[in-house]
Amino acid sequence: MKNLLSILFLFSFAHLIFGQNQDRNTFSSNTLYVGKSITVPEAYNTNKENYYDEISPKIFSLYIEQVNFPKITAKITGRGNQFSIEGIIDNDKITCLFNGKSDNGLDGMYELKIENDSIKGYWLANNQNSSEPVKKNIVLGKRTFLYNPQNMISEEFTGEIIDFEHPKNFKEKNSSQVIKYRVGTDIIYKINASTDVLTSEILKNMRKLDLEIIKNSILARHGFSFKDKTFMLYFSAESWYIPNSINVDADLTDIEKSNIVLLNQYIATANDVYKEM
């Protein structure tokens, strides 16, 4: 009987020790995860002016900086903002509770759980218009960021390049108001401003939206997080895009710096082409 009790004690002790170690290694330091947050259907408010913006997936990254069990520190980057958060790893659920405090639209409470190479959970985002937070589901995958100047915008979507975030009212001949959206061209698939030396001859007749996309493609390759919704949503569709910085100036190559200067000159004077959808 004593031997049986001794065995049970040793088994329980070993399970406690090794079980804790396994949980401690679940979240690893210096690990990057990238994914999107999606507002859960029951939190939709169809009466809000920004309803479609609220429900559209938002890409962001979570970088686990340090794990000092049970404490964990991480950095969240998204929507053109970046901030550090601290949390506690819950041994039982293998979850981590983050309480971000900021005014950048990413604050609230995060409850996350490791599943293999993914992080899943939810985010109770602070709501400026209500005391009730907005619940968003989160799915993040483990990624490694590597700058690649050859990354190009995918031609998978062969339709028109449309900026739905900046509509403009036009008065027609019959005095009615028509909403139109600025459109780009397929030139954005052909110019790589990270590798090609741009000239005035190339840029002088281009549309403003095309110029902006070509310029921001440079920043996207370096992991820049866009605050402008047009480009945040546009580059979110690219598998290579990993937002992990809010300032990439120090990372730009000489070609990129020179091209950005020239692109900015033409963006300042270029015209947009608008179309009714």
What are these regions (language model features)?
Residues N21-Y63, K71-R79, F83-E172:
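Beta-sheet ligand-binding and adhesion/scaffold domains
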